[in-house]
Regions:
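Metal- or metallocofactor-binding catalytic centers and their adjacent structured scaffolds
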Residues: 218-253, 427-432, 438-440, 545, ...
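C-terminal or mid-to-C-terminal helical accessory/interaction module adjacent to the motor/catalytic core
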Residues: 113-197, 242-246
Length: 808
């Protein structure tokens, strides 16, 4: 009998833990949750206190049987899943499904996979925390209710196959609202005035000192007036202020700050960060990666202090304790940090090394001294103007934590850090000569679109979601195609520059590319329509405060302050009638439909909406005698901004370009974009070609290329058996026959195969598949023997087929 069985949720974690425990311990993995709510059913008994109906998925049944057998043979079962709510729920499900006995079961938790942490956990077991289990169960059931009840409403009112989620819908709303802010944004111009002054340096050489007018000028006239004044002006230093500044390091990483910084510094997606962090944790290299705590243990603080002192000296050491700001921080009780602070580098994949380096530096920096900076501000008066120029300089007196780490910022976060530069020696009352003064037209910028990192930060600010939900939320909204992560090309813009050199002012216009964006989250038309529909009919679900308050209630359940069923009852009592009323309500038009105007040719209504395969333009209505005409909206267009003229252009397709081989060549638009069609052959139009301007010659070239590709695909046909064909596929040549595919062995030349040889291959492979389906789960020795015979027979038949083909 096995003395001890330890069950964790991942095989990698099991492998690491097994190293630390002796021969009396066996470590197995549950591979995550072993049961869940039924996939295709509601699985919640609302009338019986929201009792959930769980099932063991088919792919987990064999594993559960194995775990049961192992648990029955063990004296003690140690449930060692993660220490957050999901981990506690996994432990509870294992306890229930494996029918474990309380006297033989121990629950252990640890936030790092080190020998010391594991042994300490075994010395200090606890019971399963049912409050944490209830909090996880409440979230799971509430999200199932929202998803199962809202989805049919969307199918009926918007478009089939749509789905909605509680946190995901709020994330989409943030992205939709930001997009509308951008479209509504009115750019304002102003003039930024900069001057280059010539100043003697310590060694007597003349150096340049850049200065900027204290505030921007609104118009070109104001800018020109100032430059005119500067022609005859004298410039004097009216004030010099020098003040010491201290820069303090950021706190160690939480889940969200790690996701944000990894995106900025390493270019990782949120999901990628979590995947790599999971591997580091399971390898025993970092602490648990789902946490909203910034706290470090005394052990970690002392280890950091020792590492800093050894590497940089005692002056760089400054012990700090950071307070966790997140209310109800409930995941793990320590920040993300290396398990061994003395290990500045690790082995592993490039991604693992990069992320570990980021975590190590951030943790070390958090326990280092402030950076000491001296900032100097120089005010330069203009003799005949009230305006002043300002020059700033910064000298780092002691680099402190900056020696190791500098925090990055999103493009929508303004930082107060000036460009660090050293000013020459200056004194109050000193006269200055300028080399040139420039007034450059600048424009206000619209709010930037969200990146994955900035969306996580916004969700955290609003109190929506928790460390375990950020990555799945962002992945889900992209998988459902409510949001896409894409690029926006910049636009050319003209700006004006006035330049004073000596006594002459030049006036020139320049061009620049502005507004280019990469890896930004943008709503799709479907995402916008679903968002607007949910806001109209289910305002609570989309309300930021409501969603945040639900998260707080989950925290209260976890702390044992609230009953999970009471919270669900309150929610369902209001939510369910809204669903019923919305399903029953009759609306004048389909959700998301936008009427653009009237078609001048037919006099019928022109509108855009979300169709079965995406956004479409429509001429006419269902009430008209003639059926409405539809045209697919181009990918670069939006039903929010498309004009009547642009919509009417879409109906110019299909258009006939001319003839090729006696048949019409037609350009049209379909579900997957524009295409060329001729005599049953279809060729996709490349993105570089416009369907409205493509020529007959260009179309014929595309058709010829498609014909060549098709010819290479079709290797051989047989007149006497038209249903059988030899084709060239992605994984090599194969036989297609009566709706099924049959692989051709590698040692056979497909072109040499006769019809008889093909049919023999089909028969042998069909017989083999039939034999497979008849086999039981337990493979006996006789079955294995018969398999060998079949494989030999197949080889013999294919050899025979080849020789038959060659004889012909």
């Amino acid at each position: 009998m096995q003395k001890n069985l330890v069950i964790v949720e991942s095989p990698a974690k099991a492998k690491t833990i097994e190293k630390f425990l002796g021969k009396d311990f066996k470590v197995l993995s549950s591979y995550g949750h072993i049961r869940d709510l039924k996939k295709k059913e509601f699985s919640i008994d609302v009338d019986k206190d929201f009792k959930p109906h769980y099932e063991i998925p088919a792919d987990k049944k064999k594993l559960v049987t194995q775990l049961k057998e192992e648990a029955e043979q063990a004296e003690t079962v140690w449930l060692a899943s993660d220490e957050d709510r999901e981990g506690e729920a996994i432990a509870w499900h294992l306890y229930e499904v494996l029918k474990l006995k309380p006297e033989h079961t121990r629950r252990i938790v640890f936030h790092e996979i080190t020998k010391g942490a594991i042994l300490k956990a075994i010395e200090n077991p606890r019971d399963i925390d049912i409050n944490l289990v209830d909090a996880q169960q409440a979230r799971r059931i509430l999200d199932r209710i929202v998803g199962f009840e809202l989805s049919p409403v969307l199918w009926k009112k918007v478009k089939p196959a749509l789905s909605a989620g509680r946190v995901q819908s709020v994330a989409v709303r943030l992205i939709v609202e930001r997009e509308r802010e951008i479209h509504a944004f009115q750019t304002e111009a102003s003039y930024r005035v900069t001057a280059v002054f010539l100043v003697p340096d310590t060694d007597g050489k003349t150096v340049e000192m850049k200065a900027e007018l204290a505030h921007r000028l609104k118009t070109k006239a104001e800018a020109r007036k100032l430059l005119e004044s500067c022609k005859a002006a004298t410039f004097t230093i009216s004030d010099i202020t020098t003040r010491p500044l201290k820069k303090t390091p950021a706190a160690p990483f939480t889940t969200s700050t790690l996701q944000q910084e990894a995106a900025r510094k390493l270019g990782f997606t949120v999901a990628q960060t979590m995947m790599v962090a999971q591997r580091l944790y399971e390898s025993g290299l970092i602490t648990y990666m789902r946490t909203d705590s910034v706290n470090l243990s005394e052990l970690a603080v002392n280890a950091s202090r020792e590492t800093i002192s050894n590497l940089m000296g005692e002056r760089y050491v400054h012990n700090r304790h950071f307070a966790t700001k997140t209310k109800g921080a409930q995941e793990a009780h320590e920040a993300i940090r290396p398990t061994y602070m003395e290990n500045a580098k690790i082995e592993g994949t490039p991604q693992e090394r990069k992320l570990y380096d980021l975590i190590w530096k951030r943790t070390i920096a958090s326990q280092m001294a402030d950076a000491e900076v001296e900032k100097t501000t120089v005010t330069i008066a203009i003799s005949n103007e009230t305006e002043t120029f300002t020059a700033t300089g910064e000298v780092v007196k002691f680099d402190g934590f900056l020696r190791v780490y500098r925090e990055s910022y999103d493009d929508d976060v303004e930082t107060q850090e000036d460009e660090a530069r050293l000013l020459p020696p200056l004194k109050k009352g000193q006269k200055l000569e300028h080399e040139g003064i420039t007034a450059t037209e600048r424009f206000t910028q619209h709010p930037p679109r969200y990146t994955e990192a900035s969306l996580v930060r916004k969700l955290e600010e609003l109190g929506i979601g928790r460390p375990s939900t950020y990555a799945p939320t962002i992945s889900t909204i992209q998988q459902r195609e409510y949001v896409i992560k894409g690029e926006k090309a910049g636009e050319e813009r003209t700006y004006n520059v006035l330049n004073l050199q000596g006594n002459e002012i030049t006036d020139n216009n320049h061009t620049e590319i502005t507004g280019a964006e990469k890896s930004k989250l943008m709503p799709t038309d479907t995402g916008i329509v679903v968002n607007d529909f949910l806001i109209e009919y289910f305002p609570d679900i989309l309300d930021y405060n409501f969603t945040a308050s639900v998260e707080k209630q989950f925290d209260e359940i976890a702390e044992g302050d609230k009953q999970w069923t009471a919270i669900l009852k309150t929610f369902y009592k209001k939510f369910h009638p809204s669903v019923e009323n919305t399903l029953a309500a009759k609306t004048a038009h389909k959700a998301g439909e936008r009427i653009l105007g009237t078609d001048p040719v037919s006099g019928k209504q022109v509108s855009v909406k979300i169709g079965r395969f995406g956004p479409v333009a429509q001429i006419g209505t269902a009430e008209d005698e003639e059926k409405p005409r539809f045209a697919q909206v181009k990918k670069e267009m939006s039903i929010e901004t498309i004009t009547l003229e642009e919509a009417l252009e879409l109906f110019k397709l299909p258009r006939t370009l001319g003839e090729y081989e006696g048949k019409n060549v037609v350009v049209g638009a379909g579900r997957f974009g524009p295409y060329i069609q001729n005599n049953g052959l279809y060729a996709s139009l490349p993105k570089t070609m416009d369907p409205m301007t493509v020529t007959l010659e260009e179309a014929i070239e595309l058709l010829q290329k498609k014909q060549e590709a098709e010819a290479q695909k079709h290797i051989k046909k047989f007149e006497e058996e038209p249903e059988l064909e030899i084709l060239n596929g992605r994984y090599g040549p194969y036989i297609a026959y009566k709706g099924s595919n049959y692989k051709i062995p590698k040692d056979i030349i497909p072109q040499d195969l006769s019809l008889q040889a093909c049919l023999e291959i089909v028969k042998l492979q069909s017989d083999k598949e039939t034999g497979k389906s008849k086999r039981t789960a337990k493979v006996t020795k006789p079955t294995a023997k018969s398999t060998t015979k079949t494989s030999k027979a197949t080889k013999a038949a294919t050899t025979k087929s080849t020789s038959t083909a060659k004889k012909k």
